[in-house]
Amino acid sequence: MSSYTVPSSEAQTNRRSMFALLALAISAFGIGTTEFISVGLLPSISKDLNVSVTTAGLTVSLYALGAAVGAPVLTALTASMSRKTLLMWIMVIFIIGNGIAAVATSFTVLIIARIVSAFAHGVFMSIGSTIAAAIVPENKRASAIAIMFTGLTVATITGVPIGTFIGQEFGWRASFMAIVVIGIIAFIANSILVPSNLKNGVPVSFRDQFKLIKNGRLLLVFIITALGYGGTFVTFTYLSPLLQEVTGFEASTVTIILLVYGIAIAIGNMVGGKLSNHNPIRALFYMFFIQAIILFVLTFTAPFKVAGLITIISMGLFAFMNVPGLQVYVVILAERFVPSAVDVASAINIAAFNGGIALGSYIGGLVTNSLGLIHTAWVGGLMVVGAVILTAWSMTLEKRDQVK
């Protein structure tokens, strides 16, 4: 006679939570892939829709702008909705946006599709971590959020280069169709695996958001986020044409380089988290300082394959290294100055990240049009120098607070 052990209630709950987190991670993977997929597809989109590479770059900058608006504004407007209902609507909008992109026959329609997708991105980034934290015990919340964000990391490493490969082999529309499939899988997974008894969000007024922006110390960090994170995107947005037209790599090789670049980003993100645990603002100063130097050096190494590749991978290593430190420092300042709106401060900083992407990619387009692709590197470096100066100022203010 065989025997078996009935799983405990706690074990069943843990299993359900893990499957729900997996569903959120799949959603994050799709959203992370669609955010940067255009970077690898710019040459294809430019050629097929008869627009310049600079104009094609608007698929990155306007997407980021849409996400920047979507994070604080749409999150505030939907705060009273059921979390699962909102999650399902986010995925519907995500699928529709990428579906329109997959059949777009004009650049205008493609831009509209990207903005629609971006709205879903902005809201998901704001509520995804909240849902992840709500479905696990309090002592496992950080791990749950990390699992959800694994989807973004995997998207950076594999989603973008694979999407670029699909676009090169079958056309750029096929890449967006693949993202639609991911969105449908995520929708089904969320509907089945994410519990329905989640608490509604706490309504956040625009007045509360304005209070945060009025706080000088927090506003300073939001600007640092936009400049320091966004500076790299002056170059990164046009990395594919830069690698092909300036460095001289074949399109197939660019896909592999994007994969290695994604791995460098993931490593840098983990390193940045550890470096920022003790003194985030000091760590950020050195991160931005080194990234600015790398961007300036790229101006001279980009025409050479070996030197250019080493510089570009170094750029990837530092590109997202600042993200954990910036988020942690915003939370520290919000807890100190506006303790009732810590979550809102984090959401606004997410908007600042996307605002930086929008600004950086837009400036990159202007530079590419007027000066040429290679000049995006030093211009991006100047943008990061702005973050270095403001970070030094913030360090001075921090020391003054400690003296008090």
Where is each model-derived feature located?
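C-terminal membrane-cytosol helix-exit motif in multi-pass small-molecule transporters
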Residues: 180-199, 391-394
